[in-house]
Amino acid sequence: MSKKGPFNIRNAAADTFAMVVFCFITGMFIEILISGMTFEQSLASRTLSIPVNIAIAWPYGVFRDFMLRQGARISPSKFMKNIADLVAYVTFQSPAYAMILLVVGATPEQIITAVSSNVVVSCVMGVFYGYFLDACRKAFKVPGYYTPQA
């Protein structure tokens, strides 16, 4: 987790890349295989989600960092970091996901199924996304996430 500081373009770029890639892949999986949406509905949803994910990626990263700091105040353990990642992911992503599905014409039943499934799957996805985001931040050389080579 990086230290709180001024806006960092590398951080925003890493957060955006991670959000777009991760949500496209996992969203399509959930929508088609679990929620019963057609490939076309899912592709429309994933396409619509790209600008949404671009818009929310950096704010989510800031929110996640805040949640990680709050979790670390309770316990510095890896378990608490995973719980904070999970809570951050579910509470931030579920409303945005429901709105995307509504816009692309998913039925109320499909929306409830997809969002509910996403919440359940997020027990793993939120933590996995946290690791993926950290890896992206390292790859983008975000200060606090990588060690410069001497």
From Swiss-Prot:
Its main location: membrane. It is found in: Cell inner membrane. This is L-alanine exporter AlaE. Coiled coil: none annotated. It is a multi-pass membrane protein. Belongs to the AlaE exporter family. Keywords: Amino-acid transport, Cell inner membrane, Cell membrane, Membrane, Transmembrane, Transmembrane helix, Transport. The keyword Membrane applies. GO terms for cellular component: plasma membrane. The chain crosses the membrane at residues 17-37, 48-68, 86-106, 111-131. It comes from Aliivibrio fischeri (strain ATCC 700601 / ES114). One of its GO terms (biological process) is amino acid export across plasma membrane.
